[in-house]
């Protein structure tokens, strides 16, 4: 198997041109190319003066590989394809005495449960929120009627916070063992579009994610696992310094020496419980800021120039950063093309915002987080839970500023820069 990188074609090229370009790049006859797979497709729109092209990475099989490797020995864009297959790390023993427990059924909990089930461990997954379709109804209750269910909302429930976001599937974390390919293949197996396997910034979209996470849950169950909703963990069972299991809000105790805490970032009551039980934890840096919203057409024109609106490119995104002289950095985060700003709180009398896009990304406006990094050493000294306490103060203050009805306070950017209040907003698509 060979890999070609940096193979460029015009964005309007017919599908059959890709095979022809591979053959031409390698200098082989068409019948020598046995098969090829699209591994990645991206584009670079930074140079507005040049014609926009798709940039491909292709994995392929040829009739006689050795001569081609020798021929392109000095070409950094033609190499043996790396092995990106997932290597199973273990298998459950035949005499499995205790099933592992997974706490939380967001992205981490889903894949922890799925991988354990695939290895025969028959995990018990505990999720404090509801199954995804009932959770969706509760979430719309907050958006439309300002009625918050603290256990079923944007943060808690099947699929986790990512279900009501953009369904983004890319990360800046290096992945030398290609574990990300396993994740993408499992999503496709569960009903996500095939294109997430090769587009440079794959996303599924909120509405599609509901069916995908349901299918992944059914896979876990079919393999002998168990997924239980509305099961909030209130304590961990510890004897002689050894974990023995968990206790639920109902009083039920589940015993296991193996518990995975896939809590996400909003289970503050669970963090406090763990801290009180002597579980080691430390404060970490995080970022805080606001959501900015602007017309998607403005972003398309700025990023794509004359190609704005091209059907093969879709809605444009952006990523911006500013490094201030005082050492802090302000940057865009979780940019949602063609999406909406949504209320994302899970706690009474607090306001949190997030961004959300559907698969089509065809709403009028784009939005992004604009955040600044803060650290425990400078901004919230006082112990491992001091950052949570800072978040709670900010969220409570935002709740009051927004009218004490779960609507977020909003301000025009020009007014923010000028330091004056906003009296009227433009066209906005917000669920806050």
Language-model regions: role of each:
Residues 1-52, 58-429:
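Residues forming the flavin
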